Amino acid sequence: MGVASIGKIMWLLGIIAWYAIRYPFERRARRSRVVSNRRSRSDFAGLASALFGMAVLPAFYVASGIPESADYPARLWAVILGAIIFGTALWLFRVSHKMLGRNWSITLEIREQHRLVSSGPYALVRHPMYTSFFLMAVGQAFLLSNWAVGLGGLIGFALLFFLRVDKEERMMLENFGPEYRDYMERTKRLIPYIY
């Protein structure tokens, strides 16, 4: 088995683990009452972009090897680094989900008895779940030795983040007021101490 195949298997295992983490929270979210809903076309466009760049395109590549013309030689160090980054992303994804609990939703929504979470990873960044997606996209770029698939994940994440984050923060400001403004002043959006 070659290094490229190991990278593909690691990516596939990571995606399976991601869904195993997400599924129980998805089920729970469906049972929780929504008080305010900010779904929009741009929200769905961001979700679709992330889904395409971080799941559909790489799954197609793993299954078919297409686009083969964008392949480059796989390196063991890159696959190991990609697995570490993807594993870190999964850990952060799980912790973020657990901290949010019933407050989480796949679209921009405020739940009944919604509370502001500002501990755990939320003490460092306002959007650790987006940070986990960013890390998954970076991990994908190292695991799958294909320029199109690597860039596809990063572009898919960037579209999701930049189409949603401002709207999400406006919604949180409207719901939590000064408490969220104070939280914004002491935390960064995505990368601790940087951005």
Regions found by a protein language model. Name each.
Residues S119, A123-T131:
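Histidine-centered phosphotransfer motif of kinases
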Residues M1-E112, S118, M136-Y195:
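Membrane-anchoring alpha-helices and their flanking helix-loop junctions
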